[in-house]
């Protein structure tokens, strides 16, 4: 799924090669290290100082354990180092739609999106001149249609602007369909 998302966005949405940074938590997901994403898509995996402390129902609960400023600093550093054009969060930043860890990671991604280009945010990262402020162009939420049905939606809610891509199409550059790549 990670490779599918990256390649589709590069081919369909942007019409040129782009650098993407997917932000998600591996908390409670033991397979995250057993089958690293870069084996599928060539991505580099970064870790923050966030503790995996078990199940959390709300991001406020997560941030009582995680040092929000410290973790935000880590995410900003990754953005400034990697310099992606687009950030992709795996989960919604809205509380109640998923686990607290996941929601917290999406909230941190949105905050980092704003702060990474601001030289007054975490200036110690810029002090030696090796890192510079960097502003990705946009943030996308890698979701699925079921996320917009029932459950946590309120009357009158509308789905956010969406970019849909057919993952079953053949990619001539890769010589396979995206479904074949993901299989």
Q: Which residues fall in each region the model found?
A:
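Active-site beta-strand->loop->alpha-helix modules in alpha/beta enzyme cores, enriched
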Residues: 1-123
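The feature marks non-catalytic terminal segments
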Residues: 115-183
């Amino acid at each position: 799924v990670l490779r599918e998302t990256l390649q589709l966005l590069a081919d369909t949405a942007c019409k040129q090669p782009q650098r993407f940074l997917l932000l998600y938590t591996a908390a409670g997901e033991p397979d995250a290290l057993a089958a690293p994403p870069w084996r599928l898509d060539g991505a580099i995996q970064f870790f923050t100082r966030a503790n995996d402390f078990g199940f959390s129902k709300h991001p406020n609960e997560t941030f009582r354990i995680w040092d929000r400023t410290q973790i935000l600093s880590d995410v900003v550093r990754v953005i400034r180092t990697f310099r992606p054009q687009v950030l992709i969060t795996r989960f919604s930043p809205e509380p109640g739609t998923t686990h607290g860890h996941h929601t917290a990671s999406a909230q941190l991604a949105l905050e980092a999106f704003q702060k990474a280009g601001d030289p007054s945010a975490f200036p110690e990262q810029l002090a030696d001149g090796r890192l510079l402020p960097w502003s990705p162009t946009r943030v996308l939420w890698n979701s699925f249609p079921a996320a917009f049905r029932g459950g946590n939606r309120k009357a009158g809610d509308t789905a956010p602007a969406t970019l849909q891509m057919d993952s079953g199409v053949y990619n001539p550059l890769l010589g396979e369909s995206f479904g074949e790549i993901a299989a």
